[in-house]
C-alpha cells in the first residue's frame, strides 16, 4: 500500500509518497539536511537568497553549487531552484538507502523514482483545464523532475502571466529553475524563450486560461478526476501541480 505523508518545515510544505515508513523517514531526514545546509549558507551569503540574477558559486555545500549551476543555465537567481533541490535531496536520500519508489511533491515541484507508472495531475488555478488532466509517467529508475511554476497560483514571485508552466527533466533542480524562467516571460503571442531552453529539458507544458503550449517531448496526457484534496497545500494556500 502506498503511504502518503504530509511534511512541513518552515517554508517547505511537501507530500511524500512511499511504500514503507522507513523510506518516508529517510526522505524527511534528507529534506532536513538540505534545508540546514541551505540556511547555514544563506547566513554567510544573504545575496544568494535575494538575487534574481545567476550567481557563480565555486565553494559551499553541493546543494548550493548545484542550485547555482541550474539557475545559471536558466538565467535566473539560484533560489529559483530551491524547491526542486529540496525535493531531490529527499528522494536521493531514499534512493541511497535502496528505495525504488519515492515521490516528493514540494509545493508543485516534484522529484521521483518509481518502479511503477504514476499520474501527476495538472492544477492550473482557475484555468478550465485545471484538475481535468494528468501526465502519465512511466517507471523511472533514476531520479526525475516535474516542476511547475505559476503566475496566478501560490506565493512564489513571478514576472509572468501563465496559469502554469510544467517542465520535465532528469534534473529536478534544472526543471525548477527553467519553470521559473519560462513562466516569467512566456506568452501565447511570444514563445521565443523556448528557443533558448537548455538541452537537458525533455519538454514543457504551459497553460494560459483555455489555451496551452507544448514544447519538446512531454508525457502522455490523460483524463483525470478533479481531486483538490491531493494538492500539496499549507498555510500559504494551494500550489500548482499535484500527485494523483
Curated annotation (Swiss-Prot):
SUPFAM superfamilies: ApbE-like
UniProt xrefs under InterPro entries: ApbE-like_sf, MA1715-like, UPF0280
SS bond list: none
Coiled coil start-end: none
Highest taxon of the lineage: Archaea
Homology family: Belongs to the UPF0280 family.
Protein name listed in UniProt: UPF0280 protein Mhun_0136
Organism: Methanospirillum hungatei JF-1 (strain ATCC 27890 / DSM 864 / NBRC 100397 / JF-1)
Classification of source organism: Archaea, Methanobacteriati, Methanobacteriota, Stenosarchaea group, Methanomicrobia
Amino acid at each position: 500500500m502506498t503511504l502518503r505523508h504530509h511534511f512541513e518545515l518552515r517554508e517547505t510544505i511537501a507530500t511524500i509518497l512511499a511504500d514503507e515508513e522507513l523510506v518516508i523517514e529517510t526522505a524527511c531526514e534528507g529534506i532536513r539536511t538540505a534545508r540546514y545546509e541551505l540556511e547555514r549558507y544563506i547566513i554567510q551569503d544573504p545575496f544568494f537568497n535575494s538575487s534574481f540574477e545567476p550567481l557563480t558559486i565555486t565553494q559551499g555545500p553541493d546543494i548550493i553549487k548545484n542550485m547555482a549551476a541550474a539557475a545559471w543555465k536558466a538565467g535566473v537567481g539560484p533560489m529559483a531552484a530551491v524547491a526542486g533541490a529540496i525535493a531531490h535531496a529527499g528522494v536521493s536520500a531514499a534512493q541511497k538507502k535502496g528505495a525504488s519508489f519515492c515521490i516528493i511533491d514540494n509545493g508543485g515541484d516534484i522529484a521521483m523514482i518509481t518502479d511503477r507508472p504514476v499520474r501527476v495531475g495538472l492544477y492550473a488555478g482557475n484555468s478550465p483545464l485545471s484538475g481535468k488532466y494528468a501526465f502519465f509517467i512511466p517507471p523511472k529508475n533514476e531520479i526525475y523532475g516535474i516542476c511547475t511554476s505559476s503566475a496566478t497560483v501560490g506565493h512564489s514571485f513571478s514576472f509572468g502571466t501563465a496559469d502554469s508552466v510544467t517542465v520535465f527533466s532528469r534534473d529536478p533542480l534544472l526543471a525548477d529553475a527553467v519553470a521559473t524562467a519560462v513562466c516569467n516571460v512566456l506568452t501565447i503571442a511570444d514563445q521565443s524563450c523556448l528557443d533558448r531552453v537548455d538541452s537537458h529539458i525533455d519538454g514543457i507544458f504551459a497553460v494560459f486560461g483555455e489555451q496551452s503550449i507544448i514544447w519538446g517531448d512531454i508525457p502522455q496526457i490523460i483524463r483525470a478526476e478533479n481531486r483538490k484534496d491531493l494538492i500539496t497545500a499549507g498555510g500559504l494556500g494551494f500550489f500548482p501541480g499535484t500527485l494523483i
